[in-house]
Amino acid sequence: MKGGGFYQNQYLVPNVYFGNSSPVIAPIGGNALNNNNNNNNNNNNNGNNNNGININISNFQHQQHQIHQQHFGGLSPNMNQNHIIQHISHHQHQQAQQIQIIQNNNQPQPQQHQIQHQQQQQQQIQQQIQQQQIQQQQIQQQQIQQQQQQQIQQQQQQSKMNFIRGHHQRNSSFDEFSLSDVSVGSFKDMGWEEIYFCYHHFTQMDEGKGYLKSFQQLIRYITGLYPDISPSPNSQFLFSLGLLYPNALPQVQSPNMILSLTLKQMIETYSYTKSMVYSGSGSGGGNSGSGGGNSGSGGSSGNGTSGSGGSNNGSTIIINNTNLNNINNNNNTNNNNTNNINIPSTPPILRSLANGASSTNINIRKFSPQQACHIIDVFNSVKDNKTGGVSTLKLSLFGADASLLPLTTLPFHEFVQYIGLNIIPFENLFKPPPPPSSQLQSSPPIESQHLFLSEIDELTNNNQNNQNNNQQQQQYQQQQHHQQQQQQYQQQPQPQPQPQHQPFIYFEDTSNNNSPLDGNFNNSFGLFNNNNVVNHSPLGNNILNNIQQFNNQNNNQNNNNNNNNNNNNNNNNNNNNNNNNNNNNNNNNNHNNNNHNNNNNNNNQNNIFNHNQNQNNHLINNHSPNQYNNQGNILKNSGSVVEPPSQQQQYFSDIEISFSELKISSKLGEGTFGVVYKGLWRGSSVAIKQIKINEDVNNQVLEEFRKELTILSRLRHPNIVLLMAACTAPPNLCFITEYLPGGSLYDALHSKKIKMNMQLYKKLAIQIAQGMNYLHLSGVIHRDIKSLNLLLDEHMNVKICDFGLSKLKSKSTEMTKSIGSPIWMSPELLMGEDYTEKVDVYAFGIILWELGTGELPYSGLDSVQLALAVTTKSLRPPIPNAWPYQLSHLIQACWHQDPLKRPSFTEILNLLNEIP
């Protein structure tokens, strides 16, 4: 057994590898010696032999010593015990140090701890980033949903916009009916003055380009249309423009933005703005700022853009009724007083009607904005580019009565005025094929008025001018007479019956809410007889025949001119040479009662001027056989007085149609007065009410019925159902109204059970009161107001139907002595006593109660019990205590037992506005 085995196992240096399998000897003393010896072994011995021998001997001895150490486990056998103990303790100390080093290596270092902390922070940051990404995705999804909702809302708004644009088509049918929709504004009909001012101001602003290119031009255009309103309704006009034409104005608006606004857009926007500017009356009647208050050419009120002569220009443009403009001033010679009128929300013309002005008999036609554009288009297609007007001879193409027109060139304001007076039938207007260079907006000056104004002092040849005009007119009348005789001769031996004048009663009406003024001024056709005119719509299919007929007429006129050896041409030349003097004379003598030069004796009793044995170059236009004072319609360079129409034509020629024109599609309902059908008339959806009558209906009753229909057909109000036509030939006795798809208020309250709130309650109540107020001011008593006779349109607007027709109702097969429904009937009606318009006020009180409760009053009582309780015991429905005091007080006042103590609808409107 080899020595040193224990020590070899106990004193090995751990974790040390030297490349061989022999154990490592623990270091002992003499290491320095051994190292020196090793170093010495590597040295080259260059000394003497003796030194080399000694070195070799010492090395040999050292090798022997190492051999002995290896045999005894690294301990020299010559070492004593102390050396061994020291060696062991030293080795243990080294081993303890190595263990400490190993433990220190196993503990985490501070740098590693920081790295781990940073890694944890990075993980947290990554988690936060992931959460943020998730939130962003959720936000993006929400944004996508919001965008989709906005697109849906925009589509809904676009559909509403499309409805507003087509709002003028009153009889259009709609597939959907919503009780929550609310309409915004509507188109309003325009008078000839408004059409002229829209056209005139546009031509002053467009710089000959046919469109407004800047925002400054647009603002000046709006200001010119409303000279008497301060400040101008710019916001309402721009709002209407945005509704009708969303892309007309840039989204980012600035004073320097570039526009391209056409005359058609301006006219339609002006018509739509009327419903907002004059919202107080709910009618949007005439606009004094656009013709009503400016009777000069381009505004003699001082605010017009082209008028500079004040009241001296009155002969160029004469407003239909000067007194309507000067409400508080009887002096017709000073139109500048219109600026002193404070313009409230109600138009001045409507205020004059409410004040009892005698203008209810004036028959002035009004036009939709589309019709106005058609008039302008026709004018631009037939006018002379040199003079800017239309020759009177050209007007024969449109069936105009040449005897009522001056033998001069008509500027635009006279052209449109003659159309407004129906001297030039609007239905016969058509646009001839234009030359390639003509456009609707490319319009030279519409009147050469400056020629007359520049030579106002040249009045030397007035007598000669009048003689020339008289000769020219006589020759023209002879030509017309000769032409009529020739046509009558050609029609023999079987003379054709005279064509009945059946004008377009309802052409492209643009408003679901018409003006109350339309009842007095609108759609009054057939004022003048024209035996040789066949009326056609400008959009019809008979234009070629119409052109051919008038071409034949022109050929006859040319032949007559040749037979007269050019005398007519000579007279025309004289007239043209002296035209300025004639107009100057008219301008100076416009308001001078003693200096008028007349062509014909004035036989009109209603002339506002006192003409006696003088000759007149003005046309005194009185449309109705009824006498009225202070009414005049004077045109420039005219030479005759318009004869009033016959009584028969005045009463029903405009409203009566043939039953064969109607196409009945379905039955809507049936009542005691008649059966209501849905049908078609001239391409529009209408409601046809066929009347139940007895056999004892004689001609006198039918005549009264026709007269009553004529009055009712002229009623125009946004809350009145439009009466469009009627058939007055038994047994097919019926009348035609506009069709409202919303049904009756009765069905909405008691069948559909709509949810009523105060906002909707006030809206319905105010609209009913507005319609009834208009009827009463027009002299019409309804006598049968009830929820069944209140119809609704698509946007929950109320329209009153089944009014008037008292003569025919009394002959109904199932009507009793008392006309109406017992629930809504007043005590005086139930008792068969005399009654006034206050019977409608009583019924309105019952309707207010019905609106608030959604129920019918007097449940459990039959008609006899109800009549006795209402007349003898003053029975009324109970009013809930939770209702506002103002509303309760109003209802009690409306159904008061004494008719004299019931308020008028004018007072009712004021009280309704006070309800919170």
From Swiss-Prot:
Its EC number is 2.7.11.1. SMART domains: S_TKc (SM00220). Residues 283-311, 461-518, 550-646 are annotated as: Disordered. It holds the Pfam family PK_Tyr_Ser-Thr. It comes from the Eukaryota. Signal peptide: none annotated. One of its GO terms (molecular function) is protein serine/threonine kinase activity. The active site is at D784. It catalyses: L-seryl-[protein] + ATP = O-phospho-L-seryl-[protein] + ADP + H(+); L-threonyl-[protein] + ATP = O-phospho-L-threonyl-[protein] + ADP + H(+). ATP binds at L668, G669, E670, G671, T672, F673, G674, V675, V676, K689. Keywords: ATP-binding, Kinase, Nucleotide-binding, Serine/threonine-protein kinase, Transferase. Residues 623-646 have a biased composition (Polar residues). GO terms for cellular component: cytoplasm. One of its GO terms (biological process) is signal transduction. Residues 461-493, 550-622 have a biased composition (Low complexity). Residues 662-916 form the Protein kinase domain. Belongs to the protein kinase superfamily. TKL Ser/Thr protein kinase family. PANTHER family: MIXED LINEAGE KINASE DOMAIN-LIKE PROTEIN (PTHR44329:SF298), SERINE/THREONINE-PROTEIN KINASE TNNI3K-RELATED (PTHR44329). This is Probable serine/threonine-protein kinase DDB_G0267514.
